[in-house]
UniProtKB/Swiss-Prot annotation:
GO terms for molecular function: amino acid transmembrane transporter activity. It is a multi-pass membrane protein. The lineage of its organism: Bacteria, Bacillati, Bacillota, Bacilli, Bacillales. It comes from Bacillus subtilis (strain 168). Disruption phenotype: No growth phenotype is observed for the knockout strain. The chain crosses the membrane at residues 17-37, 40-60, 95-115, 118-138, 154-174, 200-220, 243-263, 289-311, 333-353, 361-381, 393-415, 419-441. This is Uncharacterized amino acid permease YvbW.
Length: 447
């Protein structure tokens, strides 16, 4: 164990950060949550993901601008604290930590569900436990090993989604064998493009925002990234490409090929359903394996992000110093182990709730991403007032883009509160209240 004076090293390169930005949001929200989004919105889910993607782009641009102006920032907590104060930074830190620890717990269960495709008789909790142990070990080895693992897992995800798009377009436009080109009739049949009206679209936004959550993890890598002032803006510029390639096109293909009201009637991911339609032997197994890797990749990133939040809090004296201690591999070992506890809580919940565990956790996570993006948006607005010179990277259409994102997020938040289960809303509100009380009782002492 190294002494307390050791700090995190800048070992992640541009290619690591670029791939984390590209693949960071490709996880359970896309592959498993997609069924829920389509079920409530129908074909209009395409509009929901387009709107969510535009909001994401504007928020990420603001994050990149703030990162460029403050090269010494370790995470986006430091960026927010400078402009919005101690409480906002404290609140952001803990809801972001809560988001990731619940997310990795949810994704451990989802990964187990996909493994059950091959091992239907094996209990979910056993499979979730095995996956949790693997992800823990990868994060404990070293930052370089984590970054390389994440790089190749993200590469696999991206490659397969590209293959999915190509095969999906062939199914839409080309007839072969027993398959007849599907066309676009499913977009308007079965109740129309908006089968549940505007309510369905608004309800789907919670899943959409959750699906996009994770992209902002590049704001947690600042202390371990070489030249973050150059790398982060470069990663953000790829956001629009990611939105179109990894969300809009796949969802357009899914709701065009499969009647929207049949997507949630089977336990399989709609991505696996499309691969089955191709008729290639074993195609569904290949897609299932790739989805499994994608979810493990997202868990990997989540454990990284949540452990760095604990490390930063401990380094600043807000948590016990043990969480700031680094191992011989220069990773915050105790912070990682603390965060893995959520994985095993997820395993315990799955022992009783089974496959429904993911749905229970996803609603609260959607709320959290909304609040995280709102805080980043408000921080960007205020940071411009403190700016004395134009940074190397800046948002050209400021403040219109940032205000659009904030107003849209507030509208979505109101709509989601009105359409989401009161249980999920109540639990989330209770967690936020607990964080606020903790700050008032204890957090102020360390400011």
């Amino acid at each position: 164990m190294k002494n307390d004076n050791q700090t995190l090293k800048r070992t992640m390169t541009s290619r690591h950060i670029m791939m984390m930005a590209l693949g960071g949001a490709i996880g359970a929200g896309l592959f498993k949550g997609s069924s829920s989004a389509i079920d409530v919105a129908g074909p209009s889910v395409i509009i929901a993901y387009l709107l969510g993607g535009i909001i994401l782009l504007f928020i990420m641009q603001g994050l990149a601008e703030m990162a460029v102006r403050n090269r010494n920032a370790r995470t986006f907590r430091d960026l927010v604290q400078q402009v919005l104060g101690n409480y906002a930074a404290y609140f952001l830190d803990w809801i972001y930590w809560k988001m990731w620890v619940l997310n990795i717990a949810a994704e451990a269960v989802v990964a187990a569900i996909f493994i059950q495709y091959w091992l239907p008789g094996c209990p979910i909790w056993v499979l979730a436990l095995g996956i949790s142990l693997i992800v823990t070990i990868v994060n404990l080895l070293s930052v370089k090993i984590f970054a390389e693992t994440e790089y190749w897992l993200a590469m696999i995800k991206i490659t397969v989604i590209i293959i999915f798009i190509i095969l999906g377009l062939l199914l839409l436009f080309v007839s072969f064998g027993d398959h007849t080109a599907s066309g676009f009739s499913n977009l308007t049949d079965h109740g129309g493009f908006f089968p549940h009206g505007g309510t369905g679209l608004i309800t789907a936004m919670l899943v959409v925002i959750y699906s996009y959550g994770g992209t902002e993890i590049i704001g947690v890598t600042l202390a371990e990234t070489k030249n973050p002032e150059k790398v982060v803006p470069k990663a953000v510029r790829s956001t629009l490409t990611r939105i179109v390639a990894f969300y809009l096109l796949p969802f357009f293909i899914i709701v065009s090929l499969i009647p929207w009201n049949q997507v949630n009637s089977v336990p399989e991911s709609p991505f696996v359903m499309v691969f089955k339609m191709v008729g290639i032997p074993g195609a569904d197994h290949i897609m299932n394996a790739v989805i499994l890797l994608a979810i493990i990749s997202s868990m990997n990133s989540g454990l990284y992000g949540s452990s760095r939040i604990l490390y930063t809090q401990a380094s600043d004296g807000r948590l016990p110093k043990v969480f700031s201690k680094l191992s011989s591999k220069n990773v915050p070992m105790f912070a990682i182990l603390m965060c893995t506890s959520s994985l095993y809580i997820g395993v315990l919940i799955s022992l009783f709730a089974g496959s429904q565990t993911f749905n229970y956790l996803m609603g609260s996570l959607g709320y959290t991403v909304l609040f995280i993006w709102l805080i980043i948006g408000f921080a960007h607005l205020k940071s411009r007032k403190q700016q004395t010179e134009t940074p190397a990277y800046y948002v050209k259409w400021f403040p219109y883009t940032t205000w659009f994102a904030i107003v849209a997020l507030l509208a979505i938040l109101i709509g989601v509160i009105m359409t989401t289960s009161i249980v999920i809303t109540g639990i989330t509100a209770a967690i936020y209240l607990l964080i606020t009380v903790a700050y008032l009782v204890k957090g102020r002492k360390h400011q």
